[in-house]
Amino acid sequence: NQNHDQIGNRAAGDRLAATLDDEGLVIAAALTLLGPFTPMLFMGEEFAASTPWQFFTSHPEPELGKATAEGRIAEFAEHGWDESAVPDPQDPTTFTNSKLDWADVSSERGAAILRAYRVLIALRRTDQAFVDHRYEANAVRFSEDHRWLVLTRGLLGPDVTPVHVVVNFADDAAEVPVPDAVGEELYGFGATEVDAGVVRFRGRGVVVLR
């Protein structure tokens, strides 16, 4: 998942929203929010913030500020980044560029991603399958060749029906077998279809079902 450290220490401070499409963002959100670990959300990711989170500083000592900027340029040059692509951490615009643009919330993309986050958070809070975090209560199946994954939660509860988080990472169509599912779709994003024991994808997407 995203956080200030992982994003800020990228050369340009670009978020996942800068490179992933909506399906990719919701897949990442589903695995973060419905996984067995305590999720952490990074400010703005819930509405696909378009602003970066760049590394910025306000050192009062000019020599320290200069050394910080030169150090970052040298660090990323080793990984093939051009100097012009690495913002100066002492430049005030590096800070202002990192502020959230609240207009993103009501944009078409932002609103769609926010709806997805709200549904996923509600599922985590209300469905008993997501309560048990013990190792044995969870299972994962995947196909490396076909690039799909099934995360199953709630395997140990006597009065809990397991929930399956089914993901297709590939751009290609996929049929993912979920033989233990009862077929109740709780959420879906992307071009998907749920049939008896099978989830069909026409591209990347995620389905949550019992």
Per-range role (PLM):
Residues 152, 175-177, 198-200:
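Ser/Thr- (and often Asn-) enriched beta-sheet segments in non-cytosolic proteins
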Residues 142, 152-153, 178-180, 188, ...:
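Surface-exposed beta-strand edges and flanking loops
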Residues 1-163, 169-174:
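Loop/helix patches that line or flank the sugar-binding groove of alpha-linked glycan CAZymes
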Residues 195-210:
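C-terminal beta-strand-rich structural cap/linker in extracellular carbohydrate-active enzymes
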Residues 163, 172-191:
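Beta-strand-rich binding/interaction modules
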Residues 36, 189, 196-197:
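A residue-level detector for conformationally permissive "hinge/kink" positions
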Residues 135-142, 182-185, 191-193:
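Short secondary-structure junctions
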